[in-house]
């Protein structure tokens, strides 16, 4: 009985190779439990006998820690067998071990948000905004009596601008330190050249005006040559021939347009048109070279300068409305075909539908600007100073609507943000409606004023459709805001293969 009191039930002295807590893996056969006979209990061996008769302990059969060594299965990621991660070859991580943490997605995961949220390749951005280049080319052709040679030259200029912007967009980000100062310098000089031409009368062959135009054209040519040299040095041999051909085409078209403007005894119109095209190109390149911060602000300012130059060409030139509308419609179809068939930027049905709505809004805005220019040109000579101010104010509203549309395209397809683009379009539609309503109140060309009002309303509806009723509910509905404010529970990262 004394032995039963001294030895607990099922317990024994710790084995030498076992756990320090006294657990030896269940091998307690030499120490019987209390149910056995107490008289046959063997005496424990001494230290010498234990060392001579000791056998290695059985493996530690713990399902959590593994076999034998507790830390045998814990190796650094660099020393692990790569065959463990063969199943991860197609997960976008090149078969490497998963990271030690899983980053959370900061974007909203609203249950009603549309799937497949993506943005186009930035290289395709000039393709989307190319209608504005053709728009300005059509204005240039109309200002220069719309001869066949001028139409061909203006179209070639627009194509070369598109080609140069598309090639430069993929390289501008790597060379932003060099491109941005040259772009800003060229834009500032050309903008002040425009401002000075407004202060000078327009007699034929004015020497000061011609010198300003030559200086602006020279700086633009230097900028284009610098960009071409950078492109030639950066790209391989397969790009050099295309770049040189595009640069020569661009310079030739600019020279032909300037010569045509001088021969038509209208250097101001030619300068305004060419500079507006160049400013738009510089805005795109500047925005692509630094998509955030000062780059976007510079693009907006350059676009404003281009819009002011466009306003000058609308006031001073004569427009061929049918030619402009046909060019806009044709290029809209071309943009749709290019973007749907281009393999480098695959389009889903959602992106294609949004692109179609943007193209439709572009046609409506172009028709509103054409109608406003017609009203302003019709009443330009017969209006008094009191009647000219509201007409000019309405035209400026239309120009601001065009600027908002350009910013909508830049934010939509440049950054992938689908919120601010439709908001800009809605604001542009409201400004167009205000311009049409003012012209209806003044009773100047009632039919065109009514069409401007209708076009603004349709643009506003398109912007609201792009914004989405569900997204509007998300930002305004109390229940949706409550869902957005709820914190998501943190999920631990599991390194399971």
Swiss-Prot record:
Residue spans of biased composition, Polar residues class: 27-41
Record PTM Phosphotyrosine, positions in chain: 112
PTM summary: Can be ubiquitinated by human ITCH and WWP2 on the N-terminus in a lysine-independent manner.
Sequence motif PPxY motif, residues: 97-101
Ranges that cross the membrane: 124-144, 148-168, 178-198, 212-232, 242-262, 268-288, 297-317, 319-339, 355-375, 389-409, 423-443, 450-470
Record's GO cellular component terms: host cell endomembrane system; host cell perinuclear region of cytoplasm; host cell plasma membrane; membrane
Keyword Iron-sulfur: no
Stretches for region Disordered: 1-108
Disulfide bridge map: none
Mutagenesis or variant effect for residue 85 to F: Loss of interaction with human SYK
Single Gene Ontology BP annotation: viral latency
Extracellular side: 145-147, 199-211, 263-267, 318, 376-388, 444-449
Similarity comment text for this entry: Belongs to the herpesviridae LMP-2 family.
Keywords: Host cell membrane, Host cytoplasm, Host membrane, Host-virus interaction, Membrane, Modulation of host E3 ubiquitin ligases by virus, Modulation of host ubiquitin pathway by virus, Phosphoprotein, Transmembrane, Transmembrane helix, Ubl conjugation
A Pfam family hit: Herpes_LMP2
Cytoplasmic side: 1-123, 169-177, 233-241, 289-296, 340-354, 410-422, 471-497
Record's keyword annotation contains Transmembrane: yes
Record-given protein name: Latent membrane protein 2
Note: In healthy individuals, EBV typically establishes a persistent latent infection in which the virus can be detected in resting, nonproliferating peripheral B-lymphocytes. These latently infected cells express only 2 virally encoded genes, LMP2A and EBNA1.
Species of origin: Epstein-Barr virus (strain B95-8)
């Amino acid at each position: 009985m004394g032995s039963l009191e001294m030895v607990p039930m099922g317990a024994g002295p710790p084995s030498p190779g076992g756990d320090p807590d006294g657990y030896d893996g269940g091998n307690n056969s030499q120490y019987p439990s209390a149910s056995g006979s107490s008289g046959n209990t063997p005496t424990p061996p001494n230290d010498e006998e234990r060392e001579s008769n000791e056998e290695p302990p059985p493996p530690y059969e713990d399902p959590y820690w593994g076999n034998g060594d507790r830390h045998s299965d814990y190796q650094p990621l660099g020393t692990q067998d790569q065959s463990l991660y063969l199943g991860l070859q197609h997960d976008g991580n090149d078969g490497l071990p998963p990271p030690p943490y899983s980053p959370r997605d900061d974007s909203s995961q609203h249950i009603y948000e549309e799937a497949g949220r993506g943005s186009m390749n930035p290289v395709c951005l000039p393709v989307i905004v190319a209608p504005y280049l053709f728009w300005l080319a059509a204005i240039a052709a109309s200002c220069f009596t719309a001869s066949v040679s001028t139409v061909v030259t203006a179209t070639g200029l627009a194509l070369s601008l598109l080609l140069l912007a598309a090639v430069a967009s993929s390289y501008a980000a790597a060379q932003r330190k060099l491109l941005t100062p040259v772009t800003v310098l060229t834009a500032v000089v050309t903008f002040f050249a425009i401002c000075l031409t407004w202060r000078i009368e327009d007699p034929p062959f004015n020497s000061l005006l011609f010198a300003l135009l030559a200086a602006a054209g020279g700086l633009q040519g230097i900028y284009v040559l610098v960009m071409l040299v950078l492109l030639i040095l950066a790209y391989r041999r397969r790009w050099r021939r295309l770049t040189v051909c595009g640069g020569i085409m661009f310079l030739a078209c600019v020279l032909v347009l300037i010569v045509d403007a001088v021969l038509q005894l209208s250097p101001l119109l030619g300068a305004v048109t060419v500079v507006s095209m160049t400013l738009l190109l510089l805005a795109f390149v500047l925005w692509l070279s630094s998509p955030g911060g000062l780059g976007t602000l510079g693009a907006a300012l350059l676009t404003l300068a281009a819009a002011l130059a466009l306003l000058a060409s609308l006031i001073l030139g004569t427009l061929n409305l049918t030619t402009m509308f046909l060019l806009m419609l044709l290029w809209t179809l071309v943009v749709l075909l290019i973007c749907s068939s281009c393999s480098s930027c695959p389009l889903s049905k959602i992106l294609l539908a949004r692109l179609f709505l943007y193209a439709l809004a572009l046609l409506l805005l172009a028709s509103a600007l054409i109608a406003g220019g017609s009203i302003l040109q019709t009443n330009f000579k017969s209006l008094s100073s009191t009647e000219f101010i509201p007409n000019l104010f309405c035209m400026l509203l239309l120009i601001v609507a065009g600027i908002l549309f350009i910013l909508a395209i830049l934010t939509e397809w440049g950054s992938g943000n689908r919120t601010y683009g439709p908001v800009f379009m809605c604001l542009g539609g409201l400004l167009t409606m205000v311009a049409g309503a003012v012209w209806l109140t003044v009773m100047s060309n009632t039919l065109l004023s009514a069409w401007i009002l209708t076009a603004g309303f349709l643009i506003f509806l398109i912007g609201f459709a792009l914004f989405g009723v569900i997204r509007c509910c998300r930002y305004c509905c109390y229940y949706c805001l409550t869902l957005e404010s709820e914190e998501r529970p943190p999920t631990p990262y599991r390194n399971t293969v």
